[in-house]
């Protein structure tokens, strides 16, 4: 009887840890989603955004937030479900990952707002390479602003932890299934939508994709033609300038 009780307690502890992890993952993804939405609001596409483009971006941003949090969740959190004595370590590691991901997302948002591209190797070379202090000047005001934003992100991260611990016991298998379906839908549906939009020249969808970091939307013009979704003669009818690029136009006037 004692052995069975001990075994049931171990199982219950594992289930609670996984429930807490599910809430952590979902809330962390929502936190990152907010930053991705801010990318769009601060971009040049916001003024001309319509409902279709906005809804597409929201779902695509959610899928991207899910994917960004998936690796640290799987690597840093899930393995400790089978290591009872170290579960607090798993929670701490994933908490640090949430914080660092959001700090990086905030810095990336600044870069995207200023330069219209996301953090890449070129930007890192400028920042940390020779003469980087001449390219990026950090005065006292900027440092204080950075500290304030860091504390704000830390506060939101702690709120996520509080929600996970407070409401983990209310998580049901049905809610987990809904979360899985939402994950799959937000990762697959935007890709298929973009494949059609790229062939049908729906610019409200194709252009806003540039706001998402490390996002590589699907294009399948040949497949769309083969399936009869679009006609070959219609590929460039709606947008004769397709392929010339509209995110960056220089010079504004002929020289």
Regions picked out by a protein language model, each given a short descriptive name:
Residues 2-222:
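Transmembrane and membrane-interface helices of multi-pass
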């Amino acid at each position: 009887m004692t052995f069975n009780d001990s075994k049931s307690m171990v199982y219950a502890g594992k289930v609670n840890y996984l429930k807490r992890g599910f809430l952590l993952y979902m809330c962390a993804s929502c936190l990152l989603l907010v930053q991705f939405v801010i990318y769009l609001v601060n971009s040049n596409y916001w003024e001309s955004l319509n409902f279709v483009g906005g809804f597409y971006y929201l779902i695509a941003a959610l899928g991207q937030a899910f994917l960004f949090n998936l690796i640290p969740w799987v690597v840093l959190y899930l393995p400790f479900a089978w290591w009872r004595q170290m579960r607090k370590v798993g929670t701490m590691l994933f908490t640090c990952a949430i914080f660092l991901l959001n700090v990086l997302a905030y810095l990336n948002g600044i870069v995207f707002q200023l330069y219209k591209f996301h953090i890449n190797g070129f930007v890192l070379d400028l920042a940390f390479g020779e003469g980087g202090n001449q390219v990026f000047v950090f005065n006292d005001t900027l440092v204080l602003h950075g500290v304030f934003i860091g504390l704000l992100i830390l506060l939101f991260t702690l709120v996520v932890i509080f929600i996970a611990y407070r409401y983990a016991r209310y998580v049901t298998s049905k809610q987990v299934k809904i979360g899985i379906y939402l994950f799959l839908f937000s990762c697959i549906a935007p890709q298929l939508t973009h494949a059609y939009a790229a062939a049908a020249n729906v610019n409200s969808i194709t252009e806003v994709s540039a706001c998402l970091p490390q996002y590589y939307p699907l294009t399948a013009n040949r497949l769309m033609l083969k399936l009869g979704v679009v006609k070959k003669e219609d590929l460039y009818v709606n947008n004769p300038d397709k392929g010339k690029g509209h995110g960056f136009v220089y010079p504004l006037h002929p020289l």
